[in-house]
Swiss-Prot record:
It comes from Gloeobacter violaceus (strain ATCC 29082 / PCC 7421). This is Large ribosomal subunit protein bL12. Forms part of the ribosomal stalk which helps the ribosome interact with GTP-bound translation factors. Is thus essential for accurate translation. The gene is rplL. Pfam families: Ribosomal_L12, Ribosomal_L12_N. Belongs to the bacterial ribosomal protein bL12 family. GO terms for cellular component: cytosolic large ribosomal subunit.
Length: 137
């Protein structure tokens, strides 16, 4: 198997936090003049001085978290479209007339928070069809 020195290095690598592993990768890139990017073609890339089949000290890539909860913002309410937008806001939020009126008049304001992507798009579309300017954050 591997020498004691290699085994110790492997154990040390396993104990690294994600931040430390990212720092290690950056340091290796700077010292050895290599990039830790995956090749575009999906083929195997061999670094100079590294034998194929030798264990590599590569840090795990940080997964990109996809946003799952969105907020629909009411950005602008044209005065001539206020009543139509008010009706849509009441339908979306379930608020009473006074609360919905306060919401519409307070634009820019969050209309609905913590909704999934499809619902957010539907709400935005309804508001825009009524004449409002809306956005998803």
């Amino acid at each position: 198997m591997a020498s004691e020195r290699v085994e110790k290095i492997l154990e040390d690598l396993k104990a690294l936090s994600l931040l430390e592993a990212a720092e290690l990768v950056k340091g290796i890139e700077e010292v050895f003049g290599v990039k830790a990017e995956a090749p575009a073609g999906g083929g195997m890339m061999v670094m100079p001085g590294v034998m194929p089949g030798a264990p590599a000290a590569a840090a795990p890539a940080e997964p990109v978290e996809e946003q799952t909860e969105f907020t629909v913002m009411l950005e602008e309410v044209p005065a001539d479209k206020k009543i139509a937008i008010l009706k849509v806001a009441r339908e979306i939020t379930g608020l009473g007339l006074k609360e919905a009126k306060d919401l519409v008049e307070a634009a820019p304001k969050a209309v609905k928070e913590g909704v999934n992507k499809d619902d957010a798009a539907t709400i935005k579309k309804k508001l825009e069809e009524a004449g409002a300017k809306a956005s998803i954050k």
